[in-house]
């Protein structure tokens, strides 16, 4: 009986250690640091989305693949601009803009050609609250949601900032980070 109990404790300990390791790998213990930065001018190619934010990955992949395959434009940063707080808005009514950040435009392609399939705009120049979080795959996005948004809400409240307004998430693949931006 003692051997079985000891084995159960070892198995439970191993599972907890494994879960803690996975959580740490995807940024679960990363320090959340807030910076006020000037940013803007990024060219955003996107689709408007209404409904559950879980659609974002599928939409982002679609925009990426069409830009790559139809226009020969390779992008390295995806993004989502999320307008509604899921705690206050019904999932079916949540609004977002999801797509890719276009860093260069091939000479043979015009903005009007891309606008036949997607919306295009520039990120407004301005002051943003910025948080960087490690990006090591889609699990990092989920861990980021659990870690960054509660910390962001506390920061906004502590500093008397406006809690309304969109949050932008930039998925910077080459630099392996998610950048959260909120206009201030």
Give the ranges of each region predicted by the language model.
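A solvent-exposed interaction/effector surface
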Residues: 2-184
């Amino acid at each position: 009986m003692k051997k079985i109990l000891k084995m159960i404790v070892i198995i439970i300990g191993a599972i907890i250690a494994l879960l803690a390791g996975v959580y740490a790998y995807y940024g679960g213990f990363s320090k959340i640091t807030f910076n006020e930065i000037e940013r803007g001018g990024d060219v955003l190619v996107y689709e408007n989305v209404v409904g559950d934010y879980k659609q974002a990955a599928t939409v982002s992949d679609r925009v990426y693949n069409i830009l790559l395959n139809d226009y020969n434009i390779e992008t390295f940063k995806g993004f989502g601009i999320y307008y509604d707080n899921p705690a206050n808005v019904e999932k079916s009514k949540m609004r977002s803009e999801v797509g890719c950040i276009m860093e260069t435009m091939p000479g043979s392609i015009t903005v009007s050609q891309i606008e036949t399939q997607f919306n295009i705009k520039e990120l407004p120049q301005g002051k943003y609250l910025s948080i960087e979080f490690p990006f090591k795959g889609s699990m990092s996005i989920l861990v980021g949601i659990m870690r960054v948004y509660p910390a962001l809400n506390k920061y906004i409240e502590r500093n008397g900032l406006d809690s309304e307004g969109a949050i932008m998430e930039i998925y910077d693949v080459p630099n392996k980070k998610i950048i959260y931006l909120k206009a201030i």
